[in-house]
């Protein structure tokens, strides 16, 4: 794993996590300049994804442990923000959930919507908002909401990290 760093180290740090099989420059190259106006910007390039390394991606947990070590070593265990899309969103979630480091603001994106052209993102958003709004607000007693509540009350298997 490599972390590419850009900008002024005195600014708040934001760490970017690309999606599955995505080259970090393809995901974030077009936003680095603007982000550097406000943030010290770090972009993670996962093991096995970087052209400068001969490594293998083992697992999400393996990469998370490397990122935790990096943040502890370089930033005393705390960064201002982290953004992850797709696979990167999973890694950001794990970083927050494990509580081995501190991230003030964790942003979890979906490569389907946050990287789509505006016209497509608007259509996708128009479809998704009516589906998820009841779950987020709890204001709508729709069939899906009742079904989800019933499923949550039953419990089930969960993965431990």
Regions found by a protein language model. Give the residues of each.
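Aromatic pocket-lining residues of Rossmann-like dinucleotide-binding sites
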Residues: 35, 95-99
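Structural signature of beta-strand start/N-cap positions in the alpha/beta core
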Residues: 13, 40, 79-81, 104-105
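Conserved alpha/beta-hydrolase catalytic His-Asp/Glu region
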Residues: 117-122, 134-161
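Conserved HGGG/HGGXW glycine-rich cap/lid loop of the alpha/beta-hydrolase fold
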Residues: 4-53
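Active-site loop/oxyanion-hole signature of alpha/beta-hydrolase fold enzymes
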Residues: 42-81
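Flexible "cap/lid" loop of the alpha/beta hydrolase fold
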Residues: 97, 103-135
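Gly/Ala-rich beta-loop-alpha elbow adjacent to hydrolase catalytic centers
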Residues: 84-92
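Short beta-strand immediately N-terminal to the catalytic nucleophile in serine-hydrolase-like folds
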Residues: 82-84, 109
